[in-house]
Every structure is written in structure tokens, then in C-alpha cells.
């Protein structure tokens, strides 16, 4: 399963990861990401998110 995650970074330097939805396959997730025109985000395995050791907005946010 894959989570569609929106990255939100604030001007003060803080970032948040917002789960938009969860999909059975990565292809479904990528299609939804394209359909919703999410550019600052991504599709990630849900197991990584549940573990709590996951901070993609700070790691992958290029803005």
C-alpha cells in the first residue's frame, strides 16, 4: 500500500507531511498525484509512514 503525501514547508523553516489518501498500488497513487496536480509531494510505502521514522518533507522538499 502507498500513501500520497503532500509536503508543506513554512517560511520559518518548519515542514509537515500531510497524507492525502492511501492506495493499493503505487501506480494508482501516482495517477492520483498527477490528477490532483500535486507537485510538492510523493507516493511512499505506507509501512514507512506507520513506523514513525519518516520525515520526507524535510528530506525531499526542494523548495
UniProtKB/Swiss-Prot annotation:
Q: InterPro entries from the xrefs?
A: DUF1482
Q: Which domain of life is it from?
A: Bacteria
Pfam families, alphabetically?
Answer: DUF1482
Specify the protein name.
Uncharacterized protein YebW
